[in-house]
């Protein structure tokens, strides 16, 4: 049985500003020593987006700055144990559940495992990248967050020419294009997700067996026996192109024999 990779436990010290700074510094030090990247200061760190862009145009207008890069996905530690599903959230995560019936998923005559609804861990990614809701639409906000600083627009990661979409400006003309980041709800031309990995127990000779209980030695992972967005992409390591868990030339052959 392949075990689900557990989400990192957020330390309660993260509620304290001083400790957040120290922990961030420690994370940067560790990542420098190991050669690994960090979400801090990356495109998924909405608290650092303003500094990285070199402008003061986004927090307070485009999205809310909650003071911690973790809470845009992870449940704040002061809400540890809370059930986000009771409030319309994705099970185990701090994002609202997308309208899953809206997705057109990949299908094929050769696909044995038909999936109707993405798993929670992939819904987490889609809740931003399908472009249907604001990137800061979290179920819980940190207790330390000042609601008077809430954003005016809560922009969506959507390439459309609408005031509520990032694509209004990020169109490749006024600013860099976000088109590749906006997946939409039609996923028929994307790699299938949330299906059981066919290489388990040598079930299909066209797929490689996993190396260990978490997936493969090169970092490609299996979650609850399934292939998910996070199987190939590692949001916590932005140093690799498009957040891949291994090099692009070796990614496909990690699973596929041909």
Spans of model-derived segments:
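Bacterial N-terminal signal peptides
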Residues: 23-31
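Bacterial N-terminal signal peptides that target proteins for export
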Residues: 4-23
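C-type cytochrome heme-c attachment and multiheme electron-transfer modules
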Residues: 2, 33-71, 75-258
